[in-house]
């Protein structure tokens, strides 16, 4: 495959995001809908797919102590800046939060069950009329903008049901046409200057981690770091990862570099690699190459599991990606990278997702632990053999199988998780 296609996919899948991407997507949608209509807000209606609704259900809004779909939508309309994309709530103020709290009776949330892929629609009614937006397939992909039933903007071929979802999704799908040996060949041989941009994710996510080490969230990252000695890069990796996620899900106003639409995925696919790099005094080039491998494997799996799913994509998809990156950084061969992925597939695949919340760092820690264990096993010639569980004869089919566990495998599980969350909130 043309290396420029791979590089473009990596660039496309990377994006700064403030807070968890699902409430950010809701806020962006309502911000844009209000932007086109203006005036005094009378009502806001949000229609979201179950996965997006679940992920935003109990997640903190950046810069506030508030959580959930309703507050995300209200704040988007009240103070959101749609031009900032997933950082649309960057300018939030205390008075905006106070105003939103007085307007909770003006918002309605509807779950759109019969839809494929990510979906969020905002209908903002004011004294000036109605503003409406639809976001599809990607968290910031606005495909429709209307003002008083007049279409102001519409992306072609994105409102119809399609197995390929959108042109952007087709691009990333090309990753799944590659064999693992082709992926590793790209990682080894691509000109370093062409992938140096991947290090931007390290700078951004490290700042978030430093914020989390102040004890935000459940304080898991801080707790782990306290028991970490100077040369233990595994515990250091867990601490960096968990503290960044602790900060993110608790509403810290520091952006993460998202990948495949998720800040947590972006954190897990990068920070464990930074930990190894720092403790072993490796250079930036080998770090960038390991990130490229980590990202590509994560993207590969996510193309089959979907952007949002019943399993914890952070621990499973991103965790598998970073396991390959860990093996690579520790000098692993192509065969050892393959065996690392087999070991991951056999371990935590199926861990459930209960949305973006304070428990995310706990699941992330499990994913990072499993990633290091899988790599160490492979580097010591220990591997789960083919035809054992979901491990297939080819590593490509094995990665596909990981995704299949989520979609279609766990669709009913996802519904029940959402039912439990809604019942528990009453």
From Swiss-Prot:
One of the GO BP terms on file: L-cysteine catabolic process to pyruvate
GO MF entries: L-cysteine desulfhydrase activity
InterPro entries reported for this sequence: Ser_deHydtase-like_asu, UPF0597
Assigned protein family: Belongs to the UPF0597 family.
Entry-linked PANTHER family: UPF0597 PROTEIN YHAM (PTHR30501:SF2)
Protein's name according to its UniProt entry: UPF0597 protein CLD_2825
Originating species: Clostridium botulinum (strain Okra / Type B1)
